Swiss-Prot record:
[4Fe-4S] cluster 1 binds at residues 61, 66, 72, 300. GO terms for cellular component: cytoplasm. The keyword 4Fe-4S applies. Keywords: 4Fe-4S, Cytoplasm, Iron, Iron-sulfur, Metal-binding, S-adenosyl-L-methionine, Transferase. This is Lipoyl synthase. Binds 2 [4Fe-4S] clusters per subunit. One cluster is coordinated with 3 cysteines and an exchangeable S-adenosyl-L-methionine. CDD domains: Radical_SAM. GO terms for molecular function: 4 iron, 4 sulfur cluster binding; lipoate synthase activity; metal ion binding. Residues 73-289 form the Radical SAM core domain. Its main location: cytoplasm. Belongs to the radical SAM superfamily. Lipoyl synthase family. It comes from Rhodopseudomonas palustris (strain TIE-1). The keyword 4Fe-4S applies. [4Fe-4S] cluster 2 binds at residues 87, 91, 94.
């Protein structure tokens, strides 16, 4: 049997994606010239990695194999992934380890706050694995982490990228009550691709989640993103834009899907930079306050700079 070994853990024999091991290889086309990243070798990268490891934390930058890790960590920007490194879902696009997670670490909020202080982060992004095994999906842990960072770093703005809290009544309200500055929940793809790409989620549940955030606290910026290159059609991407605007989402990100391993969903095509520029123009015309659309766009990439632009755009629209 083919086993996908863990390339993040120090244990090289632990299967990272056991549910994908028996799948046939899915071959993607060769990457075009515009998909290029620099190897992470700088001093800043090493310092960031040291602080992350010193505090026993996980980052989505490493676990998901983000192509922008070298650039972000060189600037001491890291996205902390809370509630462990093991996800209860098995999405076809994602490189995060899957399986049954362990118990939550009650000290993790304090560790995140301390790492935020050491890195000197002015804008922090916190994400998590899905924790369908928990009664509240991890909502209380999210809220505790936000509060810990607020106490340790009162001037740091906080952006969260959450799971969908599917069938977790009251969970969203707990997270929103902690008052993050930005609430991000990614749709990931168009509705027609959910069964093959994101089978554990429900598209319109995610739309409703984002809409509910605005109902609970209109001052919180909302954000969502999708990947392209998974077999979607252009008109479907435009429909996603309309659905997000109907939920009053402020910020849209669109990036190129890149295949983590041959056992993951294949890249169906590489969307050109001109097509991304067209999506960005259209999204602004539909009313988003902020749009980032490019081959290398990821949810947390340039998040701090984008937050400043987001605030400025809201202020300008209010005048």
């Amino acid at each position: 049997m083919v086993v996908l070994v863990d390339t993040v853990s120090a244990n090289p024999v632990r299967p990272r994606h056991p549910e994908k091991a028996a799948r046939p290889d899915a071959l993607s086309p060769k990457k075009p010239d515009w998909i290029r990243v620099r190897a992470p070798t700088t001093r800043g990268y090493g310092e960031t990695r040291g602080i992350v490891k010193e505090n026993g934390l996980h980052t989505v930058c490493e676990e998901a194999g983000c192509p922008n890790i070298g650039e972000c960590w060189d600037k001491k920007h890291a996205t902390f992934m809370i509630m462990g490194d093991t996800c209860t879902r098995a999405c076809a696009f994602c490189n995060v380890k899957t399986g049954m997670p362990g118990a939550l670490d009650a000290n993790e909020p304090a560790y995140v706050a301390e790492a935020t202080r050491k890195l000197g982060l002015q804008h922090l992004v916190i994400t998590s694995v899905d924790r369908d095994d928990l009664a509240d999906g991890g909502a209380a842990h999210f809220a505790a982490t936000i509060r810990a960072v607020r106490e340790a770093c009162p001037t740091t703005t906080i952006e969260i990228l959450t799971p969908d809290f599917l069938r977790k009544d009251g969970a969203l309200e707990v997270v929103v009550a902690a008052k993050p500055d930005v609430f991000n929940h990614n749709l990931e793809t168009v509705p027609s691709r959910y069964l093959s790409v994101r089978p554990g989620a429900r598209y319109f549940h995610s739309i409703r989640l984002l809409q509910r955030v605005k109902e609970l606290d209109p001052s919180i910026f909302t954000k969502s993103g999708i990947m392209v290159g998974l077999g979607e059609e252009r008109h479907e991407v435009l429909q996603v834009m309309d659905d997000l605007r109907s939920a009053e989402v402020d910020f849209l990100t669109i990036g190129q899907y890149l295949q983590p391993t041959r056992k993951h969903h294949a890249v169906m095509r590489y969307v050109t930079p001109d097509e991304f520029a067209g999506y960005q123009t259209t999204a602004y015309a539909k009313g988003f306050l902020m749009v980032s659309a490019s081959p290398m766009t990821r949810s947390s990439h340039h998040a701090g700079d984008d937050f400043a632009k987001l605030k400025a755009a809201r202020a300008a629209r209010a005048r």
